[in-house]
């Protein structure tokens, strides 16, 4: 990898009501949807900072908002796949996963003219319970996955912090984990979500600088609802409410400060500069 190392800002394009692991939820009426306006805020922030990002599009959101993916792509950002229904992969079988992957792919190709080469599972839900994911992704020409988080509870706390290659019957796939802050006891979720909003910005900066010294990209992630502090909320258990909405400050100023300090590039371009996955 070159020095200074490029980092990546990734956006999981879903709406305020897309929360994993809750049943019986219906899609709210269209007038309450916020994703288009919030993505617009993120695009404006990126334009001000002259930065390009990777947007993991939820297929159902792209289908219901057909102007969204073309608008993002027209700004020079990468369009990748976040699946279709925002269902944990542990609740799918291989065929259901394949069907969702291809359904989202067809939608994004029709809307943007480009086939996605990257994938991220809802809530980092690639795990030993889903050993078939890598094979399906590689079979359908995906170059990278960003679904394994080196964290407890939502990933594998002992998993690698840096990108690594996975051999499959259909070729090699890059796995690109999100940034975490290592401590003596546990890795901390400093790259996005509640951790990014809660921990001191100085700690996040120091972690990015550590990744730079290790010659590895720091991968940050953002949800559109995180630039909408006054947006609607679901009624959730205390733990899920904290994870989804806790410390509900506007993440945009923090993201802006990091974009102005460090180099960022879309994951697709980052992977293209690495050793061949063929």
What is the role of each PLM region?
Residues 49-130, 142, 147-154, 171, ...:
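Metal-dependent polysaccharide deacetylase catalytic core of the NodB/CE4 family, i.e.
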Residues 39-43, 66-70, 98-105, 134, ...:
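Generic structural signal for well-ordered alpha-helices
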Residues 48-49, 199-278:
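C-terminal domain-boundary segment and adjacent tail
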Residues 114-115, 121-221:
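Active-site-adjacent pocket scaffolds in enzyme catalytic domains
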Residues 16-21, 184-186, 229-234:
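Short acidic/His/Gly/Ser-rich catalytic and metal-binding motifs that mark active-site loops
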Residues 32, 36, 94-102, 201, ...:
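Non-membrane alpha-helical structural segments and their capping/turn regions in soluble enzymes
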Residues 10-13, 80, 120, 221:
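Generic enzyme active-site microenvironment
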Residues 2-78:
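Active-site beta->alpha N-cap acidic-glycine motif
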């Amino acid at each position: 990898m070159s020095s200074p190392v490029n980092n990546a800002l990734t956006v999981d394009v879903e709406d305020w009501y897309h929360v994993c692991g809750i049943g019986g939820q219906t899609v709210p009426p269209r007038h309450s949807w916020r994703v288009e306006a919030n993505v617009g805020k993120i695009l404006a922030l990126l334009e001000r900072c002259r930065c390009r990002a990777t947007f993991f599009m939820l297929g159902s959101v792209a289908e219901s908002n057909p102007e969204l993916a073309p608008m993002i792509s027209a700004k020079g950002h990468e369009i990748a796949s976040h699946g279709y229904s925002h269902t944990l992969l542990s609740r799918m079988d291989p065929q259901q996963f394949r069907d969702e992957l291809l359904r989202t792919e067809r939608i994004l190709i029709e809307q943007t003219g480009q086939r996605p080469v990257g994938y991220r599972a809802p809530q980092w839900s690639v795990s030993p319970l889903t050993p078939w994911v890598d094979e399906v992704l590689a079979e359908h020409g995906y170059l990278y996955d960003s679904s394994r988080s080196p964290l407890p509870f939502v990933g594998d706390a002992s998993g690698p912090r840096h990108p690594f290659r996975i051999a499959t019957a259909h070729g090699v796939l890059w796995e690109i984990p999100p940034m975490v802050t290592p401590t003596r006891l546990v890795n901390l979720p400093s790259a996005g979500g509640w951790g990014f909003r809660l921990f001191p910005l100085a700690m996040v900066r120091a972690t990015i600088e550590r990744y730079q010294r290790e010659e590895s990209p720091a991968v940050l992630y953002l949800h559109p609802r995180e630039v909408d502090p006054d947006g609607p909320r679901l009624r959730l258990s205390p733990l899920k409410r904290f994870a989804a909405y806790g410390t509900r400050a506007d993440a945009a100023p923090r993201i802006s400060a990091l974009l102005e300090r460090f180099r960022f590039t879309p994951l697709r371009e980052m992977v293209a500069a690495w050793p061949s996955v063929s």
